[in-house]
Amino acid sequence: MMNEILAAWQWNGSVSEPIPYGEGHINQTYAITVMSKPGAKRYILQKINTDTFKDPEGLMENICGVTEFLRERAKQRGADPARATLHVVPTKEEKPYYQATDGSCWRVYEFVENTVCLQQVQSAEDFYQSAVAFGNFQHQLAEYPSHTLHETIPHFHDTPKRVADFQRAVAEDRMGRAAQVQREIEFVRAREAEYHVMVDLLAAGKLPLRVTHNDTKLNNILFDKTTGEGLCVIDLDTVMPGLAANDFGDSIRFGANHCAEDEADLSKVNFSMELFEIYTKGFLQAAGEAFTPLEKQTLPWGAKLMTMECGMRFLADYLEGDHYFHINYETQNLNRARTQFKLTADMERNWDAMQKVIEKYK
C-alpha cells in the first residue's frame, strides 16, 4: 500500500522508506528523504485522520488557501516563504492530497529544515516567541476572507453547545459518577450566564469572524534551531472561521501555568500572571492593528471560556465513561477537569489584573 501512496507524487529521485515522525496523535506522520543529483531533500508524509476530519477535500482547500496567502504575504515583506508557512506538495494529478484504493487520504508537505518543535515551555522566551508566532498568524491573515473556510470540525469552540453536551452527560449519568462530583458540576452551573458572552457579541455583529487556528499550543509552532524564533505555525487541520479571543485563550489555558494537565494536588495548580503578561505582550505586538478595540477587551474572556470549556469536556467524558480522551488511570479525566476549574478560579481572582495587562499592550 505504501508503494501505491508514494507513487502518487513525482519525486525526481529515489525515495527512502517512510519513518514515523513527531509526537502528534491525530494524523499518522512520516518523514521521507528523496535522493537526487542536487542532494537529499526531506518531506513530511501524513495520513489524514478521516474519522476526525470527515471532509478531507474541504480541509485541504482550507490549508492550501491559507498557506498560499501566507506565502504571498511573506514575499511582500521580504521573508523566506519556504520558512514562513507550510508548503503542500501536489500529486502528479495536481491534487492537494491522494486518496488510496483502501480509502485512506494522504498529503505531503515540504520539510522545514533547521527547525524544532517544543512539547513544553522551557523558558519565558519560548512562550513569548509562541505568542509572536500566533499573533503574527492573525496579523498576516487579517484580510483573508474567513467566510470561505470550511468548518472542518463543526461546533468546535461553540461554548453553549459544549455546555449542552455537559448537561446531557450529567443528566444521563451513565457510569453513576455524578453524585461524587457534585462540587465540580455546581462549579460549571454557577457560571452559566457567562457561556454566551462571546457568541452573543458575535451574533450582534460586534465581533468579527477571523481565520483562527483553534489549537494554539506551543507544539504547533516550528522554532528556528539557531535563533529560537517562532517561524511557522503548523497543524492547520483545525483552521476555521472563529474568534481571535479563542485562539488567544487556548494558548493561555495551555501555557500560563506550571502544572501537569492532570495534577491531583490542586495547591500546585496556579494561573501565572507573569506568563499571561509575557504572552499578551508578544501576541498583541505581533498582531499589530489586526484587532478591533472590543476584540482586545474580550481576550481575557477567551482565556476563561476556553479553560472552562476544556474542563467541561474532561468532566463530561469522565461522566460518560472516558471514551473520548485517552486515560492511563480511572480518575485522570476528573483530575484534568479539576485543574481547569482551579485555573478558572485563579483567573477570576486576577480578572482586574488581566484587564490591566490588556490595556497596557493594546
Which residue stretches match the model-derived regions?
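ATP-dependent phospho-/nucleotidyl transfer catalytic cores
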Residues: 19-23, 46-47, 53-57, 112-128, ...
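Active-site activation/catalytic loop segments of kinase-like enzymes and analogous catalytic loops
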Residues: 245-289, 305-324
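Small/polar glycine-rich anion-binding or flexible loop at a beta-alpha turn
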Residues: 296-306
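Juxta-kinase regulatory segment immediately upstream of eukaryotic protein kinase catalytic domains
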Residues: 1-19
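Conserved ATP-binding subdomain of kinase catalytic cores across diverse folds
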Residues: 18-21, 25-35, 39-168, 242-244, ...
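Long, compositionally biased intrinsically disordered regions
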Residues: 347-350
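Catalytic activation segment of kinase domains across protein kinase-like and atypical kinase folds
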Residues: 205, 219-260
